[in-house]
Amino acid sequence: MASALRVRFAPSPTGYLHIGGARTALFNYLYARRFGGTFILRIEDTDLERSTEASLKAILDGLKWLDIDWDEGPEKGGPFPPYFQTQRLDTYRQHVDQLIAAGKAYRCYCTQEELKERRALAEKEGRTFKYEGTCRERKDAPEGRSHVVRFKMPSQEGSVSFEDLVLGKITKEYSDLDDWVMMRGDGIPLYNYGCVIDDHLMEITLVSRGQEHVNSTFPQLMLYQALGWTPPQFAHLPLILGPDREKLSKRKHKEADVMLHKANGILPEALLNFVIRLGWSHGNDEVISRQQMIEWFDFKDVGSTSGVWNPEKLLWLNQHYLKTLPPADIAGRLAPFLADKGHPLPAGDPRLEHFVLALRERAKTLDEMATMAVPYLQQGVTLDEKAAAKHLTADSLKLVRQVRDEAAALPEWSVASLDSVIKTVSERAGVGMGKVAQPIRVAITGNTVSPGIGETLLLMGKDEALRRLDAALARG
């Protein structure tokens, strides 16, 4: 095994990128970046019925959106191609043949019906089913009968153990393992076999994956031993639980879909910040930048306790990044959400940045921000009649007229210049600014709630704001 650090993320393209998969990819990526290693993406596409190009694209798109960039793999190439398991079948067959020739694996001709009967009998007798080794010493090859290839476990007593970077030392007795299936009759490798061959040939030095794979590690270690290969280190990550404290799953939890968060207006910076803390922490730090993640992350700091999905914390982090990232950056990301709501704005339109500055204190997602911005982009306004009756009186409309005329005369609109007009009119009338601002707010938004009045006028744009003020004045 090579001494240089090499880690991998090996998803199956049978659906979208799962939050658990994204965390595994992130941890491996950060570890490689911190310690000068290489991060490999390998596609385990041997489930021929469920693997699809659409799922592969969804996984790659999810990683790209999160900016988890791989060094070797699909679209990149590398020194150990191919990076798709279905393109490596000859390699798996070669090693299976070697193991059979060495007496460390064998062909099993037991039918599914026979195995089903034995499994039912074991259940009836209250014992755990283990393959009894029926074909272990079989020499004949029944004509026309399909077979699988099984690993031949040692017959003597013994145990297999490993030191997990997260869980510590774990041991299992040989007697708890049976002769597991390595390869199907059609030459497709099963998980425990294929990943060992690939991890060794791709010189992987550390395998990080979810705790649900702990039990898979023992047969894999036996295979490493049979092949005379040095196994990598292992780090098994804690489970992620949904808000209901059940294991986060594609079937039960919509939160499991990485790209759904993008569609809902969550920023990738916020999602990464949230996900890294599902099992890892750095003191009491809540907000962690990408550079800090790279500088701080280590598997020795990963806990064994399950992380629980907290939607409020994700929204809190998202609003933090909406407030602190450059407004021009957020403006570019806001544009697609406005377009989806029927209000496309060209790239660089100054209103985009105005919306960000005015709305980011209240909006928790890009989608919320876009929803708040829509009234400023619509033609015309629907007045709340109660608000209009209270604030658009004959006396208040006189103040509205003054604001309208003085604002129209401004050579350039800005928050400062518009606030100055409101202040001047209120001082001249001897009333508080609210007595002037609130009628203006109702006239242009239809209700009594909005950002600051200068910001609100600026967001509306000069032409539309004046049209709405004129419409309100026409009521009087």
Language-model-derived ranges and their functions:
Residues 2-124, 215-229:
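N-terminal Rossmann-like or analogous alpha/beta NTP/dinucleotide-binding catalytic cores
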